[in-house]
């Protein structure tokens, strides 16, 4: 089990826009790089190794996100549940197994599991998105260091953006 949070950092501004007919509404600025709210998350992970030598791993990570009130709006975004999954095949790059190549499919499924709340909540729709892709990485066993590259293609998005994602993960065990 793990706990994490996202702080509302990065530029986040709102602006007033006048609609045809004279009504004025507050909207998010189009050049924001922040979300304008805190997120707390609880996370649990499971790994299964089909062989004793652990040359393959089947992993899942379940994350539950709880969001705070959105800055400058009467809106609390609904909670999200995300399932990340992957299969990693480890291939030795050195005969002594000190350097391993990791390759395999990966993906995620994310669902909004509660309603947005507040007078600025404009839709009863719950967002969701699904993604499939792959991962490629290197593990340096003596240093307990892992570097992974990920690519995901999103599909079946509802009430949110859909696209492609690239990422890098660096992990070091101390």
Predicted features along the sequence, with ranges:
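Outer-membrane pore/translocation modules
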Residues: 1-78, 123-127, 145
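Outer membrane beta-barrel transmembrane domains
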Residues: 72-174
